[in-house]
Amino acid sequence: MVEPLKLALSKGRIFQEILPLLAIAGIYPRDDPKTSRKLVLDTNQADLKLVIIRAADVPTYVEYGAADFGVAGKDVLLEHPGNGLYEPLDLRIACCRMMVAGEPEVTPRSGRLRIATKYVHSTRRFYAERGEQVEVIKLYGSMELAPLVGLADRIVDLVDTGNTLRANGLAPLEHITDISSRLVVNKASMKMRHQRIKKFICLMAEAVEKQHG
């Protein structure tokens, strides 16, 4: 019996937006993802299972072969240090922008800026490319609070509508990069199961085109 391929997904916005795309490709989970507590879901395709994990863990599961492929935000991939992944397809879902944000009327302190963010590597890279030295403070949430209480001069975070920034008296100041979710593939799986994985990539590429017309 052929071992099913495993597609790693994270719950939340990406999961909500990938399900319609999978449906266009003719792929449906057998259990209701909204109510099921299973972390491995069967689909109507006997050779494909969905593996539900944390968003930040998707690249690791794929790189080490625990999943053959996965869906991860570009923000997560930019922070992932490994190189065992192919990134063959932009799925054009969960789109937003990675931005520098802060209090628009406040002049930052002289000397080295303090930047609070979850995206340490992306932040350091952005400022290094401009020849600026900054102090990066890693946080795991509530980024908007950091400038308000004096922890940081600026934050780097993902911005969709900007409503949360505005509600806290902040504004986007500089654009770092556009973010969307990508299909990532384990390099070894791509070689060993090339035909099956290539077929899935083509199905998803067609689904993306149909969804965006």
UniProtKB/Swiss-Prot annotation:
UniProt-annotated location(s): Cytoplasm
SUPFAM superfamilies per record: Periplasmic binding protein-like II (SSF53850)
Keywords, ordered alphabetically: Amino-acid biosynthesis, ATP-binding, Cytoplasm, Glycosyltransferase, Histidine biosynthesis, Nucleotide-binding, Transferase
Gene3D superfamilies documented for this protein: Periplasmic binding protein-like II
Gene Ontology MF term list: ATP binding; ATP phosphoribosyltransferase activity
EC identifiers of the protein: 2.4.2.17
Main location: cytoplasm
PROSITE patterns membership: ATP_P_PHORIBOSYLTR (PS01316)
The UniProt record lists the keyword Disulfide bond: no
Pathway(s): Amino-acid biosynthesis; L-histidine biosynthesis; L-histidine from 5-phospho-alpha-D-ribose 1-diphosphate: step 1/9
Gene Ontology cellular-component annotations: cytoplasm
Catalytic activity: 1-(5-phospho-beta-D-ribosyl)-ATP + diphosphate = 5-phospho-alpha-D-ribose 1-diphosphate + ATP
Top-level division of the source organism's lineage: Bacteria
Any Pfam family matching the protein: HisG
The keyword Secreted is assigned to this record: no
GO biological process: L-histidine biosynthetic process
InterPro entries for the chain: ATP_PRibTrfase_cat, ATP_PRibTrfase_CS, ATP_PRibTrfase_HisG, ATP_PRibTrfase_HisG_short
Assigned protein family: Belongs to the ATP phosphoribosyltransferase family. Short subfamily.
Comment text on domains: Lacks the C-terminal regulatory region which is replaced by HisZ.
Function according to Swiss-Prot or TrEMBL: Catalyzes the condensation of ATP and 5-phosphoribose 1-diphosphate to form N'-(5'-phosphoribosyl)-ATP (PR-ATP). Has a crucial role in the pathway because the rate of histidine biosynthesis seems to be controlled primarily by regulation of HisG enzymatic activity.
Quaternary assembly: Heteromultimer composed of HisG and HisZ subunits.
Protein name according to UniProt: ATP phosphoribosyltransferase
